[in-house]
């Protein structure tokens, strides 16, 4: 561990949430390290929808124009049973109060590629892949984040590592 380097924020998890948070913090001048357990992005979508509020956040990240090429407004939703019979159908037409479509469909790998490209444009963000966090230790004015790959120090740690969050369990 480089004892002279303390990041402002360590973000555990590099999906859309971790990447967006890193961008927003980095744009404000904070030194950010993102720790991701996987060495490569997962190639299949998990999330496929966001609403107008998320579109507003992506605009704040500086990726709205890039996202416009990979999203499609979703104006009607229909949920069906196994036989294909409609159980419920409702609309989400038009723009929400933020000025963006109320609902947009996307492919998570495409959205992540857009966000990762933006992260690469911000020099105050460092991404470390292959870092499976195993421990957090509070050292008073900072936290030590440990993994088999090493350890880092940060003033704050944020868990952006999904539903089965390691950070939450520590």
Language-model regions, residue ranges each:
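Beta1/beta-strand and adjacent pyrophosphate-binding region of the FAD-binding site
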Residues: 2-17
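Conserved dinucleotide-binding and phosphotransfer motif residues
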Residues: 28, 121-123
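Active-site-adjacent segment of FAD-dependent monooxygenases/related oxidoreductases
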Residues: 46, 51-118
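A conserved short coil-to-beta-strand element within the FAD-binding core of flavoproteins
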Residues: 129-143
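Glycine-rich FAD pyrophosphate-binding loop
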Residues: 26-46
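Core beta-strand elements of the Rossmann-like FAD/NAD(P) dinucleotide-binding domain
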Residues: 5-7, 148-156
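Short hydrophobic core segments
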Residues: 12, 152-162
